[in-house]
Amino acid sequence: MDGKLHGVTFSTLERIGGTPCVLLGLMTVKRSSKRDQVLKGLMAEAYHRALMAFPDEDVVVGTRLVAPDGMEALKSLTEIIPRTGHRAVGEERAWGRRLAKRFAVDANYDEQSFVVKSAGQSGFLDYESSKPEKIKPEIVSLFNDVNAKKGGVLIVHGWTMAESLVKLGSRA
């Protein structure tokens, strides 16, 4: 795309409690007509790195979001938490706590809503949808308690199974 920077991400691959994890600490995509393609490319790179590091394992992907648009980045994952109509069980809430601690925002984290009330924007997934009208109302409702002006974020995580990771992370 004309040799210019259109997006950047800082992420880590690590094991949290023995489980392979991709932590998307910071991702930003320039507001342009190609932003969907840029987001897809950044996520493909994250999945490729995960595939190389954890080829036969299910992987957790976690990030912080300030707006519902960012959920687009996670659309390939299964069992995304939080999600509307689903009450998170103990292990799902535990993952939220682990991620909050790893992102160093656990002091202001609410494990029931997965919301960091303030001071949570030291890094987050910054993406503005090219089709905001297509974002489902149930996704938007997850962000009702997120006060971006105070630095609030929603901690979101989901899984990619080993067989899905092979497809998501391949460079075909």
Question: Where on the chain are the PLM-derived regions?
Answer:
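Terminal substrate-recognition subdomain of acyl/acetyltransferases
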Residues: 51-172
